[in-house]
């Protein structure tokens, strides 16, 4: 008995995400919501669809994968552009099955668990697509969110035309997934920057040195910033301030450029004339501290499992313009220096040090591929909490349609 208890504890449960169409004709099952982009290759979307044989009789069942970029501004149509652009679309027929395909371990376990009316599908990402990223709207913003999202859709239809307007909504189900990048195994050189400024009526310059302990940090990890100020001037450095700045370049449509502080720390330690100070300021950039501000998030599945966007890694030779939004990070250290008239003429000087912010590699990738059907835990694939105006309108339309059917 004790051995059985110990065995059950050693084998973790595996959450399977499911979602069922309104008319119960199709139910889609996925083993994860996040798919890892390893730069040279991306994890495929493997899952199964359970069909009701009576409700899909005479119909075909398809599963599609769409990557779309939303610009987010309703007034963009004034200049003749759509504020949604599909970057990639792929579709496979799962019922009736077309040829025999090899099954993944997850699919084998799910088919064994769910029974004979379960059909596998496999959708792959090309290597040129961006990762999931979203410009978090400010509270006063309305309209579509700006960003890149990925949608998996399963639907049953008796029409040869599988266009969006031809698919019966009651027989379709949609899930938003994320494509994310994890930190590379090799780090870059330790970030370091030096700067000097010459001031009026001072013979010697003000020196600033900024260094980080490493080039790559994980989400939620404290970032110690070592600052050395060598003040050879006749002025006083009154304040030292360090910021983590998120740099987002929207390259697909407009080349908009956003620089937003996502973490700030400062010290009131003064550096008098002809003296030196070395201090360390620790910063922790978190999306939780930036909820009410416009900024960049990793995607919009749920509030609780979304981080600040990871730094973008681009495959060598790839066209940057199709990446949608390029994200990078930098540490900015800013000095406030006294002037001739005190506070009235104080000036600020600053320098930046780039670094990368990413997810760590999974601890044991092989363990994630082992499935035991008795350890499956099925969870409804709920829509994300961060809904934009279009999605709310769409859900309301679906509910109204259901009421009339």
Curated annotation (Swiss-Prot):
<dbReference type="Pfam" id="PF00339">
    <property type="entry name" value="Arrestin_N"/>
</dbReference>
<comment type="subunit">
    <text>Monomer. Homodimer. Homotetramer. Interacts with RHO (via the phosphorylated C-terminus).</text>
</comment>
<keyword id="KW-0597">Phosphoprotein</keyword>
<dbReference type="GO" id="GO:0001917">
    <property type="term" value="C:photoreceptor inner segment"/>
</dbReference>
<dbReference type="InterPro" id="IPR014752">
    <property type="entry name" value="Arrestin-like_C"/>
</dbReference>
<dbReference type="GO" id="GO:0002031">
    <property type="term" value="P:G protein-coupled receptor internalization"/>
</dbReference>
<dbReference type="InterPro" id="IPR000698">
    <property type="entry name" value="Arrestin"/>
</dbReference>
<comment type="similarity">
    <text>Belongs to the arrestin family.</text>
</comment>
<dbReference type="GO" id="GO:0001664">
    <property type="term" value="F:G protein-coupled receptor binding"/>
</dbReference>
<dbReference type="Pfam" id="PF02752">
    <property type="entry name" value="Arrestin_C"/>
</dbReference>
<feature type="modified residue" description="Phosphothreonine">
    <location>
        <position position="233"/>
    </location>
</feature>
<dbReference type="InterPro" id="IPR014756">
    <property type="entry name" value="Ig_E-set"/>
</dbReference>
<keyword id="KW-0966">Cell projection</keyword>
<dbReference type="InterPro" id="IPR014753">
    <property type="entry name" value="Arrestin_N"/>
</dbReference>
<comment type="function">
    <text>Binds to photoactivated, phosphorylated RHO and terminates RHO signaling via G-proteins by competing with G-proteins for the same binding site on RHO. May play a role in preventing light-dependent degeneration of retinal photoreceptor cells.</text>
</comment>
<dbReference type="GO" id="GO:0016020">
    <property type="term" value="C:membrane"/>
</dbReference>
<dbReference type="InterPro" id="IPR011021">
    <property type="entry name" value="Arrestin-like_N"/>
</dbReference>
<dbReference type="GO" id="GO:0001750">
    <property type="term" value="C:photoreceptor outer segment"/>
</dbReference>
<dbReference type="GO" id="GO:0007165">
    <property type="term" value="P:signal transduction"/>
</dbReference>
<keyword id="KW-0472">Membrane</keyword>
<dbReference type="InterPro" id="IPR017864">
    <property type="entry name" value="Arrestin_CS"/>
</dbReference>
<dbReference type="InterPro" id="IPR011022">
    <property type="entry name" value="Arrestin_C-like"/>
</dbReference>
<protein>
    <recommendedName>
        <fullName>S-arrestin</fullName>
    </recommendedName>
</protein>
